[in-house]
Amino acid sequence: MATKAVCVLKGDGPVQGTIHFEAKGDKVVVTGSITGLTEGDHGFHVHQFGDNTQGCTSAGPHFNPLSKKHGGPKDEERHVGDLGNVKADKNGVAIVDIVDPLISLSGEYSIIGRTMVVHEKPDDLGRGGNEESTKTGNAGSCLACGVIGIAP
């Protein structure tokens, strides 16, 4: 059973980063940094597939094995892959430090082999008042992505 994972984020533009995942009890600690972003919030999600053959678009929708509506990371009604937003500073750097109780590195909610995505816009956490909000949080296009793999 994996206790650690890593993801290298890359895109067509300047956005890149490295994200680490570590199982700690019944939660997963997500840490790392992303550079090349515009200042402000950016949606941060685990997507269904580890397929990046057509860039980030082939990663499919948010990882949602429970068939729920999109929400924020602290909401009961959320996709497993809904990790909310990362916040970039004026230098375009986002420091990631998330503890999540729903994602896992093993079992039915495992994120291993799936794609981590950082989006162009803020995630409205399902509160945008339209249908797209309940699916994607209106987070816009993908800036960078990478497949989550087992780490030593």
Swiss-Prot record:
InterPro entries: SOD-like_Cu/Zn_dom_sf, SOD_Cu/Zn_/chaperone, SOD_Cu/Zn_BS, SOD_Cu_Zn_dom. The modification Phosphoserine is found at residues 104, 106. The gene is SOD1. Disulfide bonds join 56-145. The modification N6-succinyllysine is found at residues 4, 10, 90, 121, 135. Residues 55-79 are annotated as: Disordered. Palmitoylation helps nuclear targeting and decreases catalytic activity. Succinylation, adjacent to copper catalytic site, probably inhibits activity. Desuccinylation by SIRT5 enhances activity. Cu cation binds at residues 45, 47, 62, 119. The lineage of its organism: Eukaryota, Metazoa, Chordata, Craniata, Vertebrata. GO terms for biological process: reactive oxygen species metabolic process; removal of superoxide radicals. SUPFAM superfamilies: Cu,Zn superoxide dismutase-like. One of its GO terms (cellular component) is nucleus. It comes from Capra hircus. Destroys radicals which are normally produced within the cells and which are toxic to biological systems. This is Superoxide dismutase [Cu-Zn]. Zn(2+) binds at residues 62, 70, 79, 82. Belongs to the Cu-Zn superoxide dismutase family. The modification N-acetylalanine is found at residue 2. It is found in: Cytoplasm; Nucleus. It is an enzyme of class 1 (oxidoreductase). CDD domains: Cu-Zn_Superoxide_Dismutase (cd00305). Binds 1 copper ion per subunit. Binds 1 zinc ion per subunit. Its cofactor is Cu cation; Zn(2+).
